[in-house]
Swiss-Prot record:
PANTHER family: 2-HYDROXYACID DEHYDROGENASE-RELATED, D-3-PHOSPHOGLYCERATE DEHYDROGENASE 1-RELATED. SUPFAM superfamilies: Formate/glycerate dehydrogenase catalytic domain-like (SSF52283), NAD(P)-binding Rossmann-fold domains (SSF51735). Its main location: cytoplasm. Belongs to the D-isomer specific 2-hydroxyacid dehydrogenase family. PdxB subfamily. It comes from the Bacteria. One of its GO terms (molecular function) is 4-phosphoerythronate dehydrogenase activity. This is Erythronate-4-phosphate dehydrogenase. GO terms for cellular component: cytoplasm. One of its GO terms (biological process) is pyridoxine biosynthetic process. Pfam families: 2-Hacid_dh, 2-Hacid_dh_C, DUF3410. Homodimer.
């Protein structure tokens, strides 16, 4: 069995080598010739899996993407060819949630305000949106969910309209990219909405770049009343609109979901689906594959107010480090993908156990491991 995987996918050999030959190839430049004798294909969001790519893949039986989004996969072609498909929904939801909270704490420090009591419109209440909402609520933020598809499907949570969500102090986007239908998300935030927003609002996008009209956003940012922006995703990656970067407060190269746990979890979910599809027993456990974090234990002697929480959170992950690297390198050719490929190891908050006798409800809700309370 020949298993072709994206060169940047972790754990591929550890999880799949027992089933056949694991061949790593660059995801963004993958060719039909490389899949000519492949049985299994495992990709990330940079690979467009379509009829052209699969034109020579006569042996292909299974395609998996280690991502939440599937807009890079032509599912109709896979169905037509009888190729089984799986994705990794929720694999990096914790990582994205922690990215957003880290960014909001940076903004609160930069502009001298408290997050508690502010309103947050979460556009898209799936895995990542829910993870953001849960963590924001733990900080005392009033969360308003907007997801017409989930609302129509009978989700029991309370929802608001898109227009109401856009009135919030903070607005975070967590929708998949779709270009057709009543609730298409391509340019969901278009010129009309961008121009109507208040200059003191903070907007965050860690979903897909095309959800925001980047050109219209640049025009707004060049006006007398720019918005406050946190951008992890961009239109036309990796050839992004470089002119927009200086007008953002936080800018990163599509790495919100790039915690070590998130990356490992994505590949592991494909391993589980592969085993189920082909009748193999799942013999490996994700926890056994994760290394011990460099910072894995802390003792806390203070109550967890917003200042203490910020210090703890940024000790584990401070988004400003990614922002600084991005601004330093983005003008160089090919650096967008290179920064993603060589992204430094980042751990989730659950990798740290905090010993404390204080009330640590917020820490538990945020995802830290807590002992002693």
């Amino acid at each position: 069995m020949k298993i072709v995987v994206d060169e940047n996918m972790p754990l591929a050999e550890a999880l799949f080598a027992e089933f056949g030959e694991v061949v790593r190839v660059p995801g963004r430049t993958m060719t039909a010739e490389q899949l000519a004798d492949a049985d299994i294909l495992l990709v990330r969001s940079v690979t467009k899996v379509n009829a052209a790519l699969l034109s020579q893949a006569t042996n292909l039986k299974f395609v998996g993407t280690a991502t939440i989004g599937t807009d890079h996969i032509d599912k109709a072609v896979l169905a037509e060819k009888g190729i089984n498909f799986t994705s990794a929904p929720g694999c990096n939801k914790v990582s994205v949630g922690e990215y957003i909270i880290s960014a909001l704490l940076v903004m609160a420090e930069k502009y001298q305000f408290s997050l508690s009591g502010l309103s947050l419109g979460v556009i898209g209440a799936g895995n990542t949106g829910t993870a953001v909402a849960e963590r924001a609520s733990a900080l005392g933020i009033e969360v308003k969910l907007c997801d017409p598809l989930k609302e129509q499907a009978g989700d029991p949570r309370s929802f608001v309209s898109y227009d109401e969500a856009l009135q919030c102090d903070l607005i975070s986007f967590h929708v998949p990219l779709s270009r057709e239908g009543e609730h298409a998300t391509f340019h969901l935030l278009d010129k009309k909405y961008i121009q109507a927003l208040r200059s003191e609002q903070i907007l965050l996008n860690a979903s897909r770049g095309e959800v925001w009209d980047n050109q219209a956003m640049l025009l707004r940012q060049q006006s007398a009343e720019p918005l406050l922006l946190v951008m992890d995703v961009w239109e036309n990656e990796p050839d992004i609109l470089h002119e927009l970067v200086p007008y953002t407060d936080i800018a990163t190269p599509h790495i919100a979901g790039y915690s070590l746990e998130g990356k490992y979890r994505g590949t592991y979910m494909l391993y589980e689906a592969f085993c189920q599809q082909f009748g193999y027993t799942v013999t490996k456990q994700l926890k056994q594959l994760l290394p011990v974090a460099d910072i894995n234990a802390l003792t806390l002697n203070a109550n967890t107010d917003e200042v203490v929480l910020k210090k703890l959170i940024h000790l584990v992950y401070d988004v400003r480090r990614d922002d600084a690297r991005f601004r330093h390198q983005i003008g160089l050719p090919g650096r967008f993908d290179e920064m993603r490929k060589k992204y430094p190891e980042r751990r989730e908050w659950s990798s740290v156990t905090i010993s404390s006798e204080q009330n640590n409800d917020e820490l538990v809700k945020l995802g830290f491991s807590v002992s002693g309370n």
